[in-house]
């Protein structure tokens, strides 16, 4: 039985080093998809590079934890900037959901302006779209726009709550992450998905070359290790040997 594998590189537009790493992992590796932060410092560079990589599907990486929002968000920003305090606000039930809805629509329109087309799908920086308060907003928006959505089904919600027309992969894994990146770890993710009976799987990754922006990230050098693994010829062979076909959310 053939299974669909989507290897999605998050953080397109974060920095030039991140952008170059994603393009390299697409051209010479197994990355088939990426998601772009439209408020990232290198988003124009990312859009330019994507025009030379037609085989790379580009989705939108919804941002509520970093940088400057595209709309006025007085209920979420501090000194005009987004940040990780969103977690505390979510726990306190204090999220400005109307502001978040407007920002989502604005980032979506900005994506179309940058890339000249709709995103293939939506996910989010630091998985904030999986917050119980935010998920219904993003799920409804994706369904209305006719685009797919990354869904971590280990989160607390029922499939019956999803819009009927919403598309997603059957499985999603963020396990290819951390200090122990290897071919074996990637293949374990596939094997675990197969054992669950999933016919489609998205694997999240963050391949990058190191630059000054990436150097400031808490997750720095493993991004370079990810790039090495994702561009290894043996990995592509092992993926095919397990009955997986590389694709994107356009195939869901």
Swiss-Prot record:
Cofactor(s) named in the record: Mg(2+)
Origin superkingdom: Bacteria
Gene Ontology molecular function terms on file: chitin disaccharide deacetylase activity; deacetylase activity; metal ion binding
EC numbers, comma separated: 3.5.1.105
Main location: cytoplasm
Pfam family for this entry, one: YdjC
Compartments where found: Cytoplasm
Keyword set, alphabetical order: Carbohydrate metabolism, Chitin degradation, Cytoplasm, Hydrolase, Magnesium, Metal-binding, Polysaccharide degradation
GO CC annotations, alphabetized: cytoplasm
Binding site for Mg(2+): 61, 125
Enzymatic reactions: N,N'-diacetylchitobiose + H2O = N-acetyl-beta-D-glucosaminyl-(1->4)-D-glucosamine + acetate; diacetylchitobiose-6'-phosphate + H2O = N'-monoacetylchitobiose-6'-phosphate + acetate
Subunit and partners: Homodimer.
UniProt similarity note: Belongs to the YdjC deacetylase family. ChbG subfamily.
Function of the protein: Involved in the degradation of chitin. ChbG is essential for growth on the acetylated chitooligosaccharides chitobiose and chitotriose but is dispensable for growth on cellobiose and chitosan dimer, the deacetylated form of chitobiose. Deacetylation of chitobiose-6-P and chitotriose-6-P is necessary for both the activation of the chb promoter by the regulatory protein ChbR and the hydrolysis of phosphorylated beta-glucosides by the phospho-beta-glucosidase ChbF.
UniProt name for this protein: Chitooligosaccharide deacetylase
Name of the gene: chbG
